[in-house]
């Protein structure tokens, strides 16, 4: 009932806003089909449903980039959906032409006050459209607000919210319901005893502790140039249960780890959610501290913040506004990075489509993504530019070579034969090999 109510309110709003039954039916059918296809593919790739924040990819002009992520195994599904939409549009348009009732509610904008019928019709037309949008908005916001009347009604009718686990919520309540419930985002619940006095007390406490820890230290981190590299979907495969190789897949990294300071990171996501890990690495803020409805800070939080904090600002404070630079060998608007990195204070974000684009954009064999070696060269160029400067800097790199979907891109892939893992599905083996 909860899922039906959400879809019914959307359909009703379309009918009353357009005042055309068949046009609204066409828009609703096409939108629902596109939503279903996109949701299915995203679940397949990321084990996540479509959320409202994903619409920023479309509004930001990233539709083409998103389509490049569609796996070949889903292409037939996409083609079938396109054929369905074409036939559905033809049928809906034909019915619109054949049906003599062009308007759902009688109104006349050309002669609004010609007679009582037109006056009443126009008033009712406007009120119905506004009321339908208000009802839909109230329903959507109520689903995401515990304690609201809508929330209580939904709970009484089988709604089982799991906003901390979007895929679980979608499976339990329907993807459309999950989408609507996330339309209102509350970044964080207000902690008990939260006040300016409390925060100043905490700041003083940890400043004193930091002073004690650093008492015997002569240098500062900002005395050095720091490069933060977030390697797309990188991990040590030999640590994954059930995965085995006849040769070491990361000998160079393992050698570096054995000869210098190194360690392990507990990641909140594996094989996806890169932007969330990136946000947490840059800010030090754990997503566990936020409200369950905040799923992607880069899309839902940072663009709306006035002065968000990030670690690169420590270098900016000491060396000026040009002390931090970022590199991402893909489109700048993906996850709104162009907006977010500007908010963080980075002097420039070099991407494939930035005003000053990246020079090193080579790919390996048939891979569609810029190789890691090319991305590293972009960072080395920034270091070379700094040689004559007495200032240190913070450099941020987010790579793309290992981004999904995975394909048979590489001619000399020794890991395909070296994979001696057992009890793997065909899909798992393919992902590991490629």
Region roles according to the model:
Residues 61, 226-231:
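Residue-level preference for non-acidic, small/hydrophobic
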Residues 72, 209-213, 247:
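N-terminal post-signal-peptidase region of extra-cytosolic proteins
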Residues 141-228:
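Membrane-interface segments at or immediately adjacent to transmembrane helices
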Residues 214-217, 231, 236-434:
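Solvent-exposed soluble domains appended to multi-pass membrane proteins
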Residues 46, 55-64, 177-187, 192, ...:
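Short alpha-helical interface patches
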Residues 1-165:
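Transmembrane and membrane-interface helices of multi-pass
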Residues 55-58, 172-179, 196, 250, ...:
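Alpha-helix initiation and N-capping motif
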């Amino acid at each position: 009932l909860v899922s039906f109510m959400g879809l019914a309110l959307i359909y009703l709003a379309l009918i009353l806003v357009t005042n055309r039954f068949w046009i609204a039916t066409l828009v609703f059918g096409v939108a629902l089909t596109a939503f279903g296809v996109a949701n299915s593919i995203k679940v397949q790739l990321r084990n996540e449903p479509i959320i409202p924040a994903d619409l920023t990819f479309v509004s930001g002009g990233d539709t083409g980039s998103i389509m490049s992520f569609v796996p070949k195994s889903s292409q037939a599904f996409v083609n079938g959906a396109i054929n369905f939409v074409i036939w559905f549009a033809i049928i809906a348009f034909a019915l619109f032409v054949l049906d003599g009732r062009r308007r759902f509610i009688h109104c006349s904008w050309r002669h609004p006050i010609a007679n009582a019928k037109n006056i009443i019709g126009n008033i009712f037309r406007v009120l119905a459209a506004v009321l339908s949008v208000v009802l839909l908005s109230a329903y959507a916001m109520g689903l995401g607000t515990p304690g609201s009347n809508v929330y209580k009604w939904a709970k009484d009718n089988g709604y089982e919210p799991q906003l901390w686990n979007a895929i679980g919520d979608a499976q339990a309540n329907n993807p459309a319901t999950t989408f609507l419930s996330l339309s209102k985002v509350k970044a964080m619940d207000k902690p008990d005893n939260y006040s300016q006095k409390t925060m100043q007390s905490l700041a003083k406490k940890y400043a004193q502790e930091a002073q004690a820890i650093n008492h015997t230290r002569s240098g500062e981190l900002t005395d050095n140039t720091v490069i933060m590299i977030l390697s797309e979907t990188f991990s040590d495969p030999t640590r994954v249960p059930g995965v085995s190789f006849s040769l070491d897949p990361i000998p160079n990294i393992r050698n570096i780890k054995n000869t210098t300071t190194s360690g392990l990171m507990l990641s909140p996501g594996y094989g996806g959610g890169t932007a969330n890990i990136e946000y947490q690495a840059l800010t030090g803020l754990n997503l566990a501290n936020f409200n369950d409805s905040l799923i992607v800070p880069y899309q839902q939080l940072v663009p709306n913040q006035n002065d968000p904090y990030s670690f690169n600002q420590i270098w900016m404070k000491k060396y000026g506004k040009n002390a931090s630079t970022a590199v991402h060998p893909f489109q700048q608007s993906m996850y709104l990075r162009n907006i977010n990195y500007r908010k963080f204070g980075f002097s420039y974000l070099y991407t494939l489509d930035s005003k000053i684009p990246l020079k090193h954009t080579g790919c390996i064999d048939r891979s569609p993504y810029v190789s890691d070696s090319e991305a590293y060269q972009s960072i080395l160029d920034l270091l070379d530019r700094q040689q004559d400067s007495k200032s240190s800097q913070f450099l941020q790199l987010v790579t793309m070579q290992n981004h999904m979907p995975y394909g048979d891109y590489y001619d000399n892939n020794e890991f395909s034969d070296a994979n001696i893992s057992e009890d793997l599905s065909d899909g798992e083996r393919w992902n590991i090999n490629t």
